């Protein structure tokens, strides 16, 4: 028999009854039932009930065991007594009668329990992550993550993609987020950077004659804490293709992402046909460029019904051409209590309130707005929104560029409060036609709105002849349930177009050469049309595991202060290490 086990803790079945077996694992739970000692032994594969009575030669050893001790148990498999089966366990019909116990690794007093999975402070969980990872839910999430990544790889290869690995030590690229810098010992005063993404390398691969690249790529960004991204590093399914259009990217990636979601959806519906929503339409209908399409609410511009109306606040606003009034329909929300609750919520969000109209029996409009604009306009709004008795509509007004974020939050709130959101589906969609540029109010200049290497719709002619803020790019996102899970674009592959695109954003040609010299040189020697995307592995896994916390699907994450509490990073280093790197610290005194 093997030194440590003949079977795993998840393997034993009725067919093993009367066999002598050996299992090893952790003491998950120990119960004393009137002289009978029950030990639930756990390993990576499952859990087996082991039992010792006072007649067992191992009883005294069993009495000494404590939670999370690692032990080896020899014994005989037997049928559980009638009425004690556990249908929740694959091993739930059998137990091991213990004949011998060997302690392989005793455990001290636990800083957090493994059994029971009680809520514990996050910093404790991260400091003792090796204990936290023994807990069933987190352990299963990590296994699911591995299976999802395997599925991605398999499906990418089925689509004809090849996996490549690009460098981890690269040059600093000042655009975007801050880089993690790595000082060079050999080249004093010079630094490598960890890649924020393999963007330039994957484009260089296409210029090197390769096609259909992918990798599960680690990405590093020295960003301030964000609720929707882990500090430090994250992983993406990185993709690039040559001689393709936007349609080719969609055709290649839809089956991959749909297939992964269908495989791990656990009974939830996954739409096989993805809507394609222009960016401007997404913002107007949903108040977000990553709309949650499980929520059926679509906002509408109802400005015409308030222009010149008796509701002077909106009527005066609409005298300014850029201002609009948007309506958020709320099916089933036509109660005074609900409307007052939404108004209070809006005030909590820093707004003066949230105007509303309710419709009662006979489709009669009610509320301050209805009283001010009159029955004819109220009825026109009801018809436009497709509402009836028992429904309500909420209104936001002003410059859409300023209120759109709040409008999106209000749409989400109404949908959730009225239980309109279908929690049993994954609603996937493309968002397309992103603006190439946006106006940076802080710096008073035009900036790239997304990826600076994307191709403008209309090419060089658009860059030369159009208002930059009207130029659309061949850029696209994949959204799911209110999350952006992928982003990509068709690339600028002509050097003159690349230089012009950067010039509009305030970069001179020499600055482009200095910052992106490798790619700029490659453009001079025959660059194919190419494009791709990157899908967020962490977010996809988070959605499929049914959690809203990225730390629940990551092995050893940092906390929100970008600290690894288990390994003690970031840490001080020795003066000798600093001297070797030609670094002198200049820290502010506390």
UniProtKB/Swiss-Prot annotation:
Q: Which GO terms describe its biological process?
A: aspartyl-tRNA aminoacylation
Q: What is a single Pfam family found in this protein's UniProt entry?
A: tRNA_anti-codon
Q: Where's it found, cell-wise?
A: Cytoplasm
Which E.C. number(s) belong to this protein? 6.1.1.23
Catalytic reactions on record = tRNA(Asx) + L-aspartate + ATP = L-aspartyl-tRNA(Asx) + AMP + diphosphate
Q: Which CDD domains match?
A: AspRS_core, EcAspRS_like_N
Q: Does the keyword Aminoacyl-tRNA synthetase apply?
A: yes
- GO molecular function terms attached to this record: aspartate-tRNA ligase activity; aspartate-tRNA(Asn) ligase activity; ATP binding; nucleic acid binding
Binding-site list for ATP: 221-223, 484, 536-539
Domain of life of the organism in this record?
A: Bacteria
Q: What class of enzyme is it?
A: ligase
- Keywords of this protein's UniProt record, alphabetized? Aminoacyl-tRNA synthetase, ATP-binding, Cytoplasm, Ligase, Nucleotide-binding, Protein biosynthesis
User: Where is it found, in Gene Ontology cellular component terms?
Assistant: cytoplasm
Q: Where is the region Aspartate?
A: 199-202
List of residues binding L-aspartate: 175, 221, 450, 491
Q: Which SUPFAM superfamilies does the protein's record reference?
A: Class II aaRS and biotin synthetases, GAD domain-like, Nucleic acid-binding proteins
HAMAP family to which the protein is assigned, alphabetical:
Asp_tRNA_synth_type1
Family, as annotated: Belongs to the class-II aminoacyl-tRNA synthetase family. Type 1 subfamily.
Job description of the protein: Aspartyl-tRNA synthetase with relaxed tRNA specificity since it is able to aspartylate not only its cognate tRNA(Asp) but also tRNA(Asn). Reaction proceeds in two steps: L-aspartate is first activated by ATP to form Asp-AMP and then transferred to the acceptor end of tRNA(Asp/Asn).
Q: What is this protein called?
A: Aspartate--tRNA(Asp/Asn) ligase
The species this protein was found in: Rhodopseudomonas palustris (strain BisA53)
Query: Which lineage ranks, top first, belong to the organism behind this chain?
Result: Bacteria, Pseudomonadati, Pseudomonadota, Alphaproteobacteria, Hyphomicrobiales
Gene from which this protein is expressed? aspS
